[in-house]
Curated annotation (Swiss-Prot):
Residue span of region Interaction with target base in tRNA: 102-104
Protein name: tRNA-specific 2-thiouridylase MnmA
Binding annotation for ATP: 16-23, 42, 131
Predominant location: cytoplasm
Protein function: Catalyzes the 2-thiolation of uridine at the wobble position (U34) of tRNA, leading to the formation of s(2)U34.
One GO term describing the cellular component: cytoplasm
Cell location: Cytoplasm
EC primary class: transferase
Similarity comment: Belongs to the MnmA/TRMU family.
Gene: mnmA
GO molecular function annotations of the record: ATP binding; tRNA binding; tRNA-uridine 2-sulfurtransferase activity
Length: 375
């Protein structure tokens, strides 16, 4: 990376500073590219008891240290009300309905690329920037969202619900880099976040056990655990604590005449409040041939007058899967070439055309794969 003086640009960019290494290096790179750069630290969660489970104070201090080091101003903004209304209430409603949501996707759409973008524009910014591992490309009069260059860190799955108009106002400096390069840049320039661990999990839960957190907001409704033959073999403490494909924490090991194969969650019967389980990592009911998705968001309009061959992910870090997508009266139906394991209602399916992230939606239902004949 050249150390020569950058050509000054007129564009003013406000970087979403999380207190992590990716946003830190993003701000530095933009400075080196000649942009007028400022930072903004978002607080999206307020604890009633004053306990900062999501390390907000530490993160703010790290963000401030980086901004001081590279010589830029740091703004702060509290989007906790917007987060509660537009992300957290939906998160609770999905769990109450027996689904397994992904709040990070809604947070990106409603907070980072809406509330933050609007706030930054109000402060006089021309553009915003984040430390996401994605890329953007302007083509044919619209802005496309592309996978990050580092396949191990690509975050396009989480940004699929952000519209092209918002992507067009956003920069992603580390999307062109691999993670080791980012840390090396941070270390070379003495940034406080150079060796800071990547954040994992959901911010508002932090280090707490997920079940303990959820109990604060949703009453647990215990019920039976049944096999696919209808035999009751245990009790669950609440359907919301379990997800399709789950193996750990079922409490049903060591049953007589059950064999040694581990038990897995195969489904949920919401009407009867029953958790359905089966044995074996390759249990047929763990695999699906197709899914139905709703609440579809496209980065840019997608033509689907006839079925279209695409690639898709039904979870983060999954390799792209070949499928055919068609629009039906019920929603968007994706039929896969190969069996898909543990397709989970409430999670997102995201569609790709090569490196271009087209968009995606929320999985409503999955169709079992017929291993006895044609799929």
């Amino acid at each position: 990376m050249s150390e020569s003086a950058p050509t000054p640009r007129r564009e003013r960019v406000i970087v979403g500073m999380s207190g992590g290494v990716d946003s830190s290096v993003s701000a530095l790179l933009l400075l080196q590219q000649g942009y007028q750069v400022e930072g903004l630290f978002m607080k999206n969660w307020d604890e009633d008891d004053g306990t900062e489970y999501c390390t907000a104070r530490e993160d703010l201090a790290d963000a401030q240290a980086v901004c001081d080091r590279i010589g830029i101003k740091l703004h702060t903004a509290n989007f906790a009300a917007e987060y509660w209304d537009n992300v957290f209430e939906h998160f609770l409603a999905e769990y109450k309905a027996g689904r397994t949501p992904n709040p990070d996707i809604l947070c990106n759409r409603e907070i980072k690329f809406k509330a933050f973008l609007d706030y930054a524009l109000m402060l006089g910014a021309d553009l915003i920037a984040t430390g996401h591992y994605v890329r953007r490309r302007d083509r044919d009069g619209r802005t496309e969202l592309l996978k990050g260059l580092d396949p191990n860190k690509d975050q396009s799955y989480f940004l699929h619900a952000v519209g092209g108009e918002q992507i067009a106002r956003s920069l992603f400096p580390v999307g062109e880099l691999e993670k080791p390069e980012v840390r090396a840049i941070a270390e070379k320039h003495g940034l406080a976040t150079a060796k800071k661990k990547d954040s994992t999990g959901i911010c508002f839960i932090g280090e707490r056990r997920f079940t303990d957190f959820l109990k604060q907001y949703l009453p647990a409704q215990p019920g039976d655990i049944e096999t696919t033959e209808g035999k009751v073999i245990g009790r669950h403490s609440g359907l919301m604590y379990h997800t399709i494909g789950q193996r750990q924490g079922l409490g049903i090991g060591g049953l007589k005449e059950a064999g040694d194969d581990p038990w897995y969650v195969l489904g949920k019967d919401l009407q009867r409040n029953v958790l359905l389980v089966g044995q074996g990592n390759d249990h047929p009911l763990l695999f699906s041939r197709a899914l139905l998705a709703s609440r579809i968001y496209w980065v840019n309009p997608v033509e689907l007058e006839r079925p279209r061959r695409l690639r898709a992910k039904v979870r983060y870090r999954q390799s792209d899967q070949d499928c055919v997508l068609e629009k039906t009266a019920e929603g968007y139906r994706a039929v896969f070439d190969e069996p898909q394991r543990a397709v989970t209602p409430g999670q997102s399916v995201v569609f790709y055309d090569g490196d271009v992230c087209l968009g995606g939606g929320v999985i409503e239902t999955a169709e079992a794969w017929d291993f006895g004949g044609r799929p």
